[in-house]
């Protein structure tokens, strides 16, 4: 039940804090998990700041040195532990803490199992899909580098990258790469470099270490931040056998910081060699083409027609004249044949013409209606007839019919 109070009848601080202490006391003893962010020993007591493994939340834990030493080996800063503790609320100061009764290290097998469950969950969301990974630029203008302060990883990346491409530029952000400050500092550096207008690719690099040392690079919040980045990210954490979750979400995984430098910038010597090879190949192709054309020209030049072109022209002229004469003869013969044929046809037409028959003394006899009379039997005495001769005609009257005396 809530405490009764009003502006006129408020509850004293001690009463409220005592009530809060009572509520907390009723929680009982519980197991909690976290990472040791700070550890101080004073007298016979140990004071621990325990950080949540995912969220930026921490709590104060106190225990005796005996309890601390019982967790063989005693945990140090950065260790992942589970604590059996009793919640405690100190009323005089209004502070909350846990009184640890037992501390245990999180086992390697349990850590690996949790990481695998997280990996599967993130993979199911599509954060590790190859389709969302971006290609690195061939020659980045500026490379962002997130690494430990004065670390071997930083030296490896810078030295190898500059050896390969001396003109490469870097924006370096030195951060904590293990412990409770690693995740927030790496995320802050990532956000800053991702917003940098000249940075074309970001390398997150760290040397080798134990599974616990590399845990920050399997942090869910960091993995999601890398997935959301607009700039391509290269993961170069630990050695080749180390595989934090950052390797899965990064656009490219490098086995070591040195390998990251090799994958991010090209080798100037290799590029010069490639240019030389391409230049030589182009020269060979060009020279081969010229040689083929020269051979073709030589073969054309060696042909007889090109050795004495006037002779070939004269030969063609003779062929033209010969064809002209042949055509003329053929045309003349055809015209002669056509003339003879026409004369023959004219003679036949003349022989068959009625005018020719009339010229030999014959006449055509017609009645008054124009019908031709073919026999005297067709004419009645006294009938008017019209006679047509070769050049003129006359009108006659039939009198008597005579028998043919021929």
UniProtKB/Swiss-Prot annotation:
**Quaternary context:** Heterooligomer composed of large and small subunits.
- What PANTHER family does the entry give? EXODEOXYRIBONUCLEASE 7 LARGE SUBUNIT
Q: What does this protein do?
A: Bidirectionally degrades single-stranded DNA into large acid-insoluble oligonucleotides, which are then degraded further into small acid-soluble oligonucleotides.
Q: Indicate what this protein is called per its UniProt record.
A: Exodeoxyribonuclease 7 large subunit
Per the record, what is one GO cellular component? cytoplasm
Ribosomal protein found in the keyword field:
no
Q: Which reaction does it catalyse?
A: Exonucleolytic cleavage in either 5'- to 3'- or 3'- to 5'-direction to yield nucleoside 5'-phosphates
Q: Does the keyword Hydrolase apply?
A: yes
Q: Give compartment(s).
A: Cytoplasm
Disulfide partners: none
Protein EC: 3.1.11.6
**Which family is it part of?**
Belongs to the XseA family.
Print the keywords alphabetically: Cytoplasm, Exonuclease, Hydrolase, Nuclease
Write one Pfam family the protein is assigned to. Answer: tRNA_anti_2
What Gene Ontology molecular function terms does this protein carry?
Answer: exodeoxyribonuclease VII activity; nucleic acid binding
């Amino acid at each position: 039940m809530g405490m009764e109070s009003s502006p006129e009848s408020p509850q004293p601080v001690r009463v409220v804090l005592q009530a809060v202490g009572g509520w907390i006391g009723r929680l009982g003893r519980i197991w909690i998990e976290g990472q040791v962010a700070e550890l101080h020993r004073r007298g016979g007591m140990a004071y621990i700041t325990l950080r949540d493994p995912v969220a930026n939340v921490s709590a104060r834990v106190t225990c005796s040195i005996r309890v601390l030493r019982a967790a063989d080996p005693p945990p140090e800063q950065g260790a992942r532990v589970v604590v059996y503790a009793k919640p405690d609320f100190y009323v005089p100061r209004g502070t909350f803490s846990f009184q640890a009764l037992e501390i245990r290290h999180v086992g390697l097998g349990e850590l690996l199992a949790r990481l695998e469950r997280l990996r599967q969950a993130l993979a199911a969301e599509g954060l590790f899909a190859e389709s969302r990974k971006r290609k690195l630029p061939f020659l980045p203008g500026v490379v962002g580098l997130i690494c430990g302060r004065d670390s071997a990883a930083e030296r490896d990346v810078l030295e190898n990258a500059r050896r390969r491409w001396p003109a490469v530029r870097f924006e370096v952000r030195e951060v904590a790469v293990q412990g409770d400050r690693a995740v927030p500092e790496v995320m802050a550096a990532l956000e800053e470099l991702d917003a940098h207008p000249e940075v074309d690719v970001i390398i997150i690099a760290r040397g080798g270490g134990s599974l616990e040392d590399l845990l920050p690079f399997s942090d869910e919040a960091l993995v999601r931040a890398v997935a959301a980045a607009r700039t391509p990210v290269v993961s170069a954490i630990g050695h080749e056998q180390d595989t934090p979750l950052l390797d899965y979400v990064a656009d490219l995984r490098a086995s070591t910081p040195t390998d990251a430098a090799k994958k991010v910038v090209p080798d100037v010597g290799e590029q010069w060699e490639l240019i030389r090879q391409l230049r030589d190949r182009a020269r060979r192709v060009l020279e081969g083409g010229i040689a083929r054309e020269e051979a073709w020209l030589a073969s054309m030049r060696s042909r007889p027609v090109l050795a004495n072109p006037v002779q070939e022209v004269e030969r063609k002229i003779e062929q033209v004249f010969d064809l002209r004469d042949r055509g003329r003869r053929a045309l003349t013969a055809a015209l002669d044949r056509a003339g003879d044929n026409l004369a023959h046809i004219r003679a036949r037409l003349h022989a068959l013409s009625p005018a020719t028959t009339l010229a030999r003394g014959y006449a055509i006899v017609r009645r008054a209606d124009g019908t031709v009379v073919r026999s005297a039997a067709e004419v009645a005495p006294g009938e008017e007839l019209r006679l047509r001769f070769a050049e003129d005609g006359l009108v006659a009257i039939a009198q008597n019919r005579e028998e043919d005396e021929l």
